[in-house]
Structures are given as C-alpha cells and as structure tokens.
Amino acid sequence: GFDPKILTAQRVIIHGREDILGVMGTILIHVMTDEERSKVTKSNEYFIDTGMSADKVKQLVRIGDPITRERALIEMGDCVNSKSLDNRISVFVQIEVMKALQNKEVPYDIYAVFTVQEEVGLRGATAAASGIDPDFGIALDVTMAYDLPGAAAHERISSLHGGTAIKIMDGATICDYRMVEFM
C-alpha cells in the first residue's frame, strides 16, 4: 500500500484503457490553513493530475482502474531501490535456489510455490500446502532492515548486509525450534 504522508508529487501510472502518467496532488501548501498543514492528508483527499482535460480522462479511465507508482529501478551504492521489490526478490531467490538444486541428489521432494494473498491470511500458501501436504515448508519473504539512526536496539530485528533473517514468531505463527535451529 501507500503511505498517505508521502504521496504528494509522486508519479503514478493509471492503468485505464491506456496507461496514463500522472502526479499525485492535493491542496497547495501555500493555500492550506494552519489546521490543514498540521494534519496528514488522507488518501481520499488526493487527486491525480494527468495534464488532460476532464473529458479525455473520462474516456480513458474507469472507476476501479488500478494505479501504480511510476518508479524505475535505481542503484544506491551496493543496493537497489524500486517499487514492489519485496515479492519480486523472493521469486528471484526461489528460482535461483531451484536452479542450484536442479542437478543435485536430495533425499526428499522439493516444491517451489509462488503464492498470492499473503497479506490477507496466507490464502495462496494454504491452498498450495493442502495440495502438496508437505512435511515442512519454508516461506521466503522480506523484512525491514531497521538499523536506522534513532532506532532502539529492541526494534532492530535485522540489519542491512547482516545476512538472512529467520523468523521465530509473529502474530500468526510460532516456528518449531528444531526448524529454526536447522536453518
């Protein structure tokens, strides 16, 4: 999702009858009241400036058309930044693992599953697991590198360049200690 605090002036693409570039906008800061300046703009208070007439927009855009951020991949030192990297990185890593295992003898069956709806209850993973009935599963995902200035020590669950993070528990799962130790 989007953090409404950072939407102003973000470039987006409206995926309507054709892709349309736009810029997120809201009331200009120099005409806002003091009260308006002191609060966070809600996502429904933004508009998208396409530079087109209202009639042209109505021809090309329907209610419900998806909107994505317009962001190119950039290199930042030895890191990269782009939109939607979390799931894409996990897919890349999983494909590379399967390539590395392709010609190796392993004493068990390995399934690589790419699933959907993780954020709303692991629906895709649940469906895949019920069809495969695995002895154990390893989920790949990303987490925050919270080694930022001002972060308290207990908030630093992982650090950039610190290696793989292995989850022990979250709000839905407590991982088996044997699996955690194995990994």
Q: Where are each of the predicted segments found?
A:
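N-terminal hydrophobic/helix-forming segments and targeting peptides
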Residues: 1-183
